[in-house]
Amino acid sequence: MTETEIREIIISGLSQIAPEADFEELSPTENIREELDIDSFDFLNFLIGLDDKLGVDIPESDYEKLISMNDLIGYLQERLS
């Protein structure tokens, strides 16, 4: 799966919990939760959605690594390869 495809899946998932967000303005290196004002419960639901969509199990111990868009893309690329 390409980086672009993974990014589109991430944005699709984020749009479910932050439908008003402008994802074109989302920084690839900034904290997604802060930029989109997402609480921990919504972020957890987003990660569960990624697991459902991609079949990638994301252990709770890895949540702290998933801060920015780049973090998410890199993490998912590694597990999907």
Labelled PLM ranges:
Residues 1-23, 77-80:
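Thiotemplate assembly-line natural product biosynthesis machinery
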Residues 18-37, 55, 59-61:
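Phosphopantetheine carrier-protein modules
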Residues 29, 69, 75:
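Short acidic/histidine-centered micro-motifs embedded in hydrophobic/aromatic stretches
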Residues 42:
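Two-component histidine kinase catalytic core, primarily the HATPase_c
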